[in-house]
Curated annotation (Swiss-Prot):
Function: Negative regulator of abscisic acid (ABA) responses during seed germination.
Official protein name in the record: Probable protein phosphatase 2C 75
SUPFAM superfamilies xref list: PP2C-like
Enzyme Commission number(s) of this protein: 3.1.3.16
Cofactor binding notes: Binds 2 magnesium or manganese ions per subunit.
Cofactor: Mg(2+); Mn(2+)
Length: 416
């Protein structure tokens, strides 16, 4: 993945080269986008250049051309947005946001994934509507969503985005025979928990045995340290007609908005969490404070896929939440810590609810001012995309220093 680093100027400067002019023009365009989102007047284009460049200092190119024809398989383009999983996505398009297909079987969702201020893109996002129709769900479709936040490179997060949903599908399609003791709901819950844990275990085994080059570690001639230092968090959500199943390892997070209240469906795995610290120390490791609590002073999350050199202190095993859907469920937000480091769960839910309300016009064009310069005639985004976009931009405005990936699933207007 190409690395991009920009030195942001806070003054006019004397360089009037074409490159600098283009950079300033992009910043002016970004400032006008921000004005459209945060309600500032369009006259902001007449502000002093110094103030404008400071305000848009994150300078993220939000109108990257989408280069992926499917969701799942590769990380989002640097600073760009994932392309929609539709046949028309093969055509040239520069739409910065998109919406999930609005069929009777699929939930409505919006995705945004940007590099932000980080020097490289290590996040990956996967969306697989209608993943399969397993027996455990009475032959009805299940929908898969996931956010992966890589570290030590994007190798493991990319591998997760291409493989995890396949493992989940394979586990679901197996004949899940077991003694059906207890109520029907208890049996279904045990089966789902087993499916997710086995899928995560298989994913970790693949990640720790696969080199950066894609070859099995014992068979390649690469430096073994390259594969050993790469890892990824993983938060996955499987949506069915009756339930939401979330599995999480690491510090990416899933939050359900129910009747206006934020309900965490995952718990961040941080080394200073008492139970995680005890587990790490029992495995022979240490939690050192180096710019925050870290496993052996290195990794800021206590669980992850991969990270072979920190096993067994860094565990792969996910915590699984099995929750029945209710009529008050409004939306589900999955995001990497680039969002959660600067936004609380309740604030994220409040923003998503505002965007998903019926009275909120889905035709609100976040890029109206930018389209004055490069009009592409694209359709307006859905409310789910509006929510994901606004959350991302708010995180950028709050100086988030990491990649930011956000998935917003509309549970109120999706078919059940």
């Amino acid at each position: 993945m190409t690395e991009i680093y920009r030195t942001i100027s806070t003054g006019r400067g004397d360089d009037v080269s074409p490159t600098k002019c283009r950079e300033r023009r992009r910043r002016r365009i970004e400032m006008r986008r921000q004005a459209a989102v945060f309600g500032e007047p369009s006259s902001s284009r007449n502000r002093d250049r110094t103030d404008m460049e400071v305000y848009s200092s994150f300078d993220v190119p939000l109108r990257k051309q989408a280069r992926r024809s499917e969701i799942g398989g590769l990380p989002a383009d640097i600073g760009g947005f994932l392309a929609p999983p539709a046949a028309s996505s093969c055509q040239k398009s520069e739409a910065p946001v998109w919406k999930g297909e609005e069929t009777e079987d699929e939930p409505l969702y919006g995705i945004v994934s940007v590099m932000g201020r980080s020097r490289k893109m290590e996040d990956s996002v996967t969306v697989k509507p209608n993943l399969c129709k397993p027996e455990v769900n009475r032959q009805r479709p299940v929908h898969f969503f996931a956010v992966y936040d890589g570290h030590g490179g994007s190798q493991v997060s990319t591998l997760c985005s291409t493989t995890m949903h396949t493992f989940v599908k394979e586990e679901l399609e197996q004949n899940l025979e077991e003694e059906e003791e207890g109520s029907e709901n208890d049996v279904v819950e045990r089966k789902w928990r087993g499916v997710m844990k086995r899928s995560f275990k298989r994913m970790d085994e693949m990640a720790t045995s696969t080199c950066v080059c894609g070859t099995s570690v014992p068979l390649c001639n690469c430096d073994p340290r390259e594969a050993a230092i790469s890892g990824s968090t993983a938060v996955t959500a499987v949506l069915t007609h009756d339930h939401i199943i979330v599995a999480n390892t690491g510090d990416s997070r899933a939050v359900l908005c129910r009747n206006g209240m934020a309900i965490p469906l995952s718990n961040d795995h941080k080394p200073d969490r008492p139970d995680e610290r005890a587990r790490i120390e029992a495995a022979g490791g240490r939690v050192l404070v180096v710019d925050g609590a870290r496993v052996e002073g290195i990794l800021a999350t206590s669980r992850a896929i991969g990270d072979r050199y920190l096993k067994p202190m860094v565990a792969w095993e996910p915590e699984v939440t099995f929750m029945r859907r209710e009529s008050g469920d409004e939306c589900l937000v999955l995001a990497s810590d680039g969002l959660w480091d600067v936004l609380s769960s309740q604030l994220a839910c409040d923003i998503a609810r505002f965007c998903l309300r019926e009275e909120t016009p889905s035709s609100l064009d976040l890029n109206r001012m930018a389209q004055e310069d490069d009009n592409d005639g694209e359709q307006n985004p859905s409310r789910s995309v509006l929510a994901a976009t606004l959350l991302t931009r708010l995180a950028l405005g709050r100086q988030s220093s990491d990649n930011i990936s956000v998935v917003v699933i509309d549970l109120k207007n999706s078919s059940q």
